[in-house]
Each structure stands twice: as C-alpha cells, then as structure tokens.
From Swiss-Prot:
Family: Belongs to the bacterial ribosomal protein bL20 family.
Keyword vocabulary terms for this entry: Ribonucleoprotein, Ribosomal protein, RNA-binding, rRNA-binding
GO biological-process terms attached to the record: ribosomal large subunit assembly; translation
UniProt function note: Binds directly to 23S ribosomal RNA and is necessary for the in vitro assembly process of the 50S ribosomal subunit. It is not involved in the protein synthesizing functions of that subunit.
Gene behind this protein: rplT
Gene Ontology molecular function, alphabetical: rRNA binding; structural constituent of ribosome
Gene Ontology CC annotations of this record: ribonucleoprotein complex; ribosome
S-S bridge residues: none
Record Pfam families: Ribosomal_L20
Protein's name according to its UniProt entry: Large ribosomal subunit protein bL20
Keyword RNA-binding: yes
HAMAP family: Ribosomal_bL20
Amino acid sequence: MARVKGGVVSRKRRKRILKLAKGYYGAKHILFRTAKEQVMNSYYYAYRDRRQKKRDFRKLWITRINAAARMNGLSYSQLMHGLKLADIEVNRKMLADLAVNDAAGFTALADAAKDKLAK
C-alpha cells in the first residue's frame, strides 16, 4: 500500500481555521497557531455571552422600569408587587418598552398598581 502524506488534509484544516479568523487583528488572522488559539477563545466568548446577553437585557429592562416607576412615585419592587396583586401579567420587556415609548400607558399601569397597594 502506498504511503499517504497528509498535505491535502492539513491544508484544508488550516484553511478552515484561517477562514474563521478572517478579520482578526494582527497576526491572529495570518499565523495558524495564534489564529487557532483566537478562534477557540472566540467560540468560548460567543458561548458565554449568549447566556450573558439574557442577563444584560433583563438588567436593562429593570433599570428602565425602575426609572419610570420612580417618576410615578413607586419603587420597582412596589410596582411589580402592585401589578401582581392587580393580576396584571406584563413581562419586564413589555413594561420597559411601555416606559420608554408610551409613558401614558405606563402611568396607567402604575396607577393600577398603586390602587392595589393602597388596599
């Protein structure tokens, strides 16, 4: 049986890594070893940050809701508790959108929460 040299396979493997590293800074898109290391790190960052993104958006929504709630004389926790007592099920994403784009609608929800808290 003839000896098989791995040139084609090796070139394909290196080319695949360098293609993934396209646009990276400095030697990280030219040299195979540094490109491979950076691609591995990039996969790690992407995996980690897909999870982090959910936390970051929730924090942003809570911050926006809290700011709008305080303009209506409530804290964030009081608003959420009042909405729960009033059987108003609006998620944080929608509440934050209302707080930014529809102040009157948010005020109506805040007033409903205030009424339930007063009772």
